[in-house]
Curated annotation (Swiss-Prot):
GO terms for cellular component: cytosol. It is found in: Cytoplasm. This is tRNA-2-methylthio-N(6)-dimethylallyladenosine synthase. Keywords: 4Fe-4S, Cytoplasm, Iron, Iron-sulfur, Metal-binding, S-adenosyl-L-methionine, Transferase, tRNA processing. [4Fe-4S] cluster 2 binds at C157, C161, C164. It catalyses: N(6)-dimethylallyladenosine(37) in tRNA + (sulfur carrier)-SH + AH2 + 2 S-adenosyl-L-methionine = 2-methylsulfanyl-N(6)-dimethylallyladenosine(37) in tRNA + (sulfur carrier)-H + 5'-deoxyadenosine + L-methionine + A + S-adenosyl-L-homocysteine + 2 H(+).
Length: 446
């Protein structure tokens, strides 16, 4: 393999994919590759893909067509498609897209240098085997900036929700050693990072391979290892979130008071068909426990409109749930069949597309009203905001987030991204709060 070949990664999808791209970059750098700033400067272009939502292949199809043209001009250019899409739709990759030289699933990144080497010999190659032990222990991600960092604490999912493709693209659950996670958190704190997010398809299922320690124990250990760093986590499953975890959040001041708890539907019958393993009464009890233990906590969720067999009364139950819980934010989608899932194999996709879209819009409209009202209640208060970046829409202002994950835009003054700032909130929309600086709590040491 020629020394110093340049690679460029384009990442699609979730936070886990962002973390995986950092792992991919580290593997290639350690093998002697160099990073390219743009696709045009690269010898190897890697697309790290997500298969969770509808039309995952179509999202990369246009880019692959562009790369097909680029390969005619640059004969040695190699293109690899990585992540969940090739793991889920392997047959389609090579047959439909001649630009692709190699594909690799989420458990194969350690072997990318040899895969690229094979593809350089004009052999289209694939590495898609699941590795039930692979958690990329010992590989430190390449990270952009020094404000926020992701640490994947576990990979895969055992829940087998009927609509979800994750168990088929990322395999069964396996966890990072607790000592490795806390050690990485400590390193990030010493390097000056302000925020760490612990990632997993279902973090509540975390189990230390050596001791069996739970996620609440891991979260507590990370909070102690990085006491001056904000600690977040995602994603939780309602049936698995524990009182012990909630108590840990309440006990440690640097664990953010924000819980993302996907409910998917407000109907018990739909939840049963989804194979979620809980009902609405159990979900509402978890919400009550969270709010009792964490005054002022912000809550977000996921909603799917138009799942198989959903009736109008099921849809109304979802709207009622939104009114009851009054989430601060929600990720909302209409159902689309994902090949290979339990729903695709056993349930008819029998809700009309027009009904799916109408129901989704009604959910969005209601949630925007609720989010707007929740944000209005924050106006007049003072919040601690971690400045993250320049505001794209408001020159001279910074965008940051509160402990509760509310987005805040405020006048920059002498502040910079990474500063922790006290901001008086003066106005709001359904998505964003605006305010004026009242003081600097802690400056970012660049």
């Amino acid at each position: 393999m020629p020394e110093g070949r340049r690679f460029y990664i384009q990442t699609f999808g979730c936070q886990m994919n962002e973390a995986d791209s950092g792992i991919i970059a580290r593997v290639l750098l350690d093998a002697g590759f160099r990073r390219a700033d743009t696709e045009q400067d690269a010898d190897v272009v890697l697309l790290n893909t997500c298969a969770v939502r509808e039309n995952a292949v179509e999202k990369i199809a246009h880019l692959l067509e562009h790369l097909k043209g680029a390969k005619k001009r640059r004969k040695t250019l190699q293109v690899g498609v990585l992540g969940c899409v090739p793991q889920h739709q392997r047959e389609e990759m090579f047959s439909r897209f001649p630009a692709i030289d190699f594909i690799a699933g989420p458990d194969s990144y350690r072997r990318l240098p040899s895969l690229i080497d094979d593809a350089a010999s004009a052999v289209r190659s694939a590495m898609l085997d699941f590795d039930p032990s692979e958690t990329y222990v010992g590989i430190r991600q390449v990270r952009e900036g020094r404000i926020s960092a992701f640490i994947p604490v576990m990979r895969g999912c055992n829940n087998m929700c009927a609509f979800c493709v994750v168990p088929f693209t990322r395999g069964r659950e396996r966890s990072q050693p607790l000592a490795m996670v806390t050690g990485e958190a400590r390193e990030l704190a010493e390097a000056g990072y302000r925020e760490i997010t612990l990632l997993g398809q279902n973090v509540n299922s975390y189990s230390d391979p050596a001791s069996g320690a739970t996620f609440s124990a891991l979260l507590d250990a990370v909070a102690l290892a990085a006491p001056d760093v904000r600690i977040r986590f995602t994603t939780s499953h309602p049936k698995d979130i524990s009182v012990g975890l909630i108590d840990t959040i309440a006990r440690r001041p640097n664990i953010c008071r924000h819980v993302h708890l996907p409910v998917q539907s407000g109907s018990d019958s739909v939840l049963r068909r989804m194979n979620r393993g809980h009902g609405i009464s159990e979900y509402l009890e978890k919400i009550r426990i969270i709010r009792d233990a964490l005054p002022g906590v912000t809550l977000s969720t996921d909603i799917i409109a138009g799942f198989c067999g959903e009736r109008e009364e099921d849809h109304r139950a979802t709207l009622d749930l939104l009114r009851t819980v009054r989430f601060d934010a929600a990720f909302m989608f209409h159902y689309s069949t994902r090949e290979g899932t339990l729903a695709a194999r056993t349930l008819p996709d029998d809700v009309a597309e027009t009904d799916k879209k109408r129901r989704l819009q009604e959910i969005i409209d209601l949630q925007q009203e609720i989010s707007a009202e929740n944000n209005r209640r924050q106006v007049g208060t003072v919040a601690e905001v971690l400045a993250e970046s320049e505001s794209r829409r408001s020159p001279g202002r910074l965008l940051g987030r509160t402990d509760g994950n509310r987005a805040v835009v405020f006048d920059r003054g002498e502040c910079m991204p990474g500063d922790l700032v006290r901001v008086r909130l003066t106005s709001s929309t359904s998505a964003t709060l605006s305010g004026s600086r009242e003081g600097l709590i802690r400056a970012f040491l660049s």
